[in-house]
Structure formats: structure tokens, C-alpha cells
Amino acid sequence: MKTKVLLQINVTANWGSTGKIAEQIGLCAMMNGWESYIAYGRWCNPSKSHLIKIGNKLDMYMHYAEQRIRDNEGLCSRGATKRLIKLISEIRPDVVQLHNIHDHYLNYRLLFEYLNKTEIKVVWTMHDCWTFTGHCSHFITKGCERWKTDCFDCPLQREYPKTLFDRSKKNFTMKKNLFGANNNLTIIACSEWIANFVRQSFLKNKSIRVINNGVDLNVFKNSASLCTNKKIFQVLAVSNVWNKDKGFDDILNLRKILSSEYEMTIVGVTKQQLNSLPQGLVGIERTQNVQELVALYSKADVFINPTYADNFPTVNLEALACGTPVITYRTGGSPEAIDERTGVVVEQGDVNGLVEAIYRMKEDPLSSADCRKRAEKCFDKDKCFEKYVELYEKLI
């Protein structure tokens, strides 16, 4: 009997949030007797799956340069994608699991022209909105709704993936035709929030399911041995990238308002950002050291996530698993991670609301045990990612 084969495609492998999700899905598949491959564009950590590198640095730089001028993200890297397709035909996967196929490493037109001719089952997890727009990965920052009918004159032309010329109308039509033509496509949404958008997009007639992301509860757990100064209330913020959309400016403003009784730590800053942080804001560069992150989550009295554009942030789940309550903006699927016993939702951009929530959290702390219980009930990676494998088994 042929061993079932899973091939996942993502920009990273076991690196960053989507890369770690792919790694966990691969591990779960292997535990159920599957052979697992992960094809990736750049940045990886060691993996239990077979890794396939797509292209090289020159491919990436050429893709980036062409996209910056012509607005054709995902339509370059032709040679690299042809080589990937050759490998796909050799390993003959039963399921191709897509994650982020944008970010300068893959040609989605070539990939889908190939997949659409095969009987391979395709499962695509929506980590952002790029799949069903003509350009952007998150349209909520501009309140744009053109993606519901036909993208044109993109108001986010200067945002990722930034470009000189606007061809959002052509991109939208091409995506609609290519992705819509695949009769073996199943859509996974990480949150109810993004699922509702998919149901309004040109993918609305596809099978759409919601599977929340999960975290490793054996890794992300409270470090009880930590000794903290309880005279100082610890506020933590973590992100892979810090920019305006992630709430970096709001973090700076928050630091100006809070007194010295509150210590703020921000993880994931660049060297340049680190050197420009105001006094009283502790900066830590992006780290792949999980134990360091666990220690920071466990030390914190509250975790804040002032994001303006997000789907279902893994950092919220990691904080809860470490017993730390979450304060988040009402953005995307971020509020779905918490309930009234484990966090507070603040209206987007309301820095004073963040301050008030932090004050309340200090005066009347939420239960660390309740945070952990919610993580165990809803976001155990083994339970969450097992749902992917159950789906694969049904599809084949």
C-alpha cells in the first residue's frame, strides 16, 4: 500500500508563525503514517519533514525588483517554480497544503496551471487576505471592499507588496480564474473573522472550514521558578515585525503615559528600532529562542497586542498558554483568542483604552489558571492540527 504523501508550500519552514504551523501539521501527519515534505522560499530551522528549497537569493531579488515595478507579486520566479513542479510530479503528493505563497519566491500562475490539471487535493490556509485581492494582504486598514467584486485603483498600492504601477484589476481577474478553476480546493480559515471575508469573495463557492491555530502546551507553559519584582507591573508585547500596522507607534505612546510603576518590554524590534526606543521601554530583538520567549511571557503580568491588521495572532495563544492575560485591539480574529475571563478587547487605536485596561488588570488581575485552561481547551496544537490530518484523510 502506497504511503500517503503531504506536501506543504510556505515562504518559511519551521520559522515564524506560518512556518511553525506548517511544521506542526507535518509532525501530526507523520504521526498518522504520512510522509511529509515542506517546500519553502527562505528562512528555515531544522525540520522533521523533508525540506525543499524553492529558488535562491538571486531568484528572490529578481522577483522583488520586478514586483516593485510591475505589481506582479507571485508571477515571477518562473524557473524556480518549474523546478518545484518537476519535484511535485516526482514525489506525487496526495495532498498539497498551501500556506503563504506570496512574498517573492513562487509563481502562482505556473503552480495552479499545473495543479488544475491534476487530481491532487489542494488545501489552502488563509493566513491573510492576499489570496482573494488584486494586491494587498490586509485591506482593513483602508476599509476597502473592492475585493468583493473587482479590484482596481488599489488604495494600498504603496503598502506590502509595495509597487510603482497598479495592476490590481489584472491580478484580481487572474487569481479569480486560476484559483476558482481548481475543483479540488478546500479553504481553511484560521479565524471566523477571515472565514467571513472568504465567504464574500470569489472563493465563496469552495468548501470553507475554520481551524484555529494551536501552540505546543508542553513548551508554552508558566515558568513557576521565575522570581519577579511584584512592585513593578510587567507589560509585554511580541511581534515578528514591528511597524505601524502592528501598533508600534501606539506602544511608544503607551510608554509615555504609563508611570515608572509599569515596566514595558517589546520583543521583535530591529537594531535600528532598538537604538531609538525611549527610556523605560525595554527592547529585545527578534528571537528564535523559544525558552527565552516562554520566560518573557511567564514574567509578564499582561500581554498587549495593539495590532491594526491581523488574522489570528499566535502570540495571543502563546501568552495564554503561559498563564498571561491578553489585551488586544478589536482587530481581525485577534479578539477570538480570549473571553471575559482571560483578556480585554479595546477599540482599535484607543491608546487611552489600553491604559485603562492595564490599570484595571493591575487592580483586579485576571486568573492565570483561567488563561491556561482556555489554552488547553481551545488551542492545544495536537487537537488543532489533528483536524488538518482528519480533513486530508477524508479528501483522499
Where are these regions (language model features)?
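Carbohydrate-associated surface elements
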Residues: 193, 214
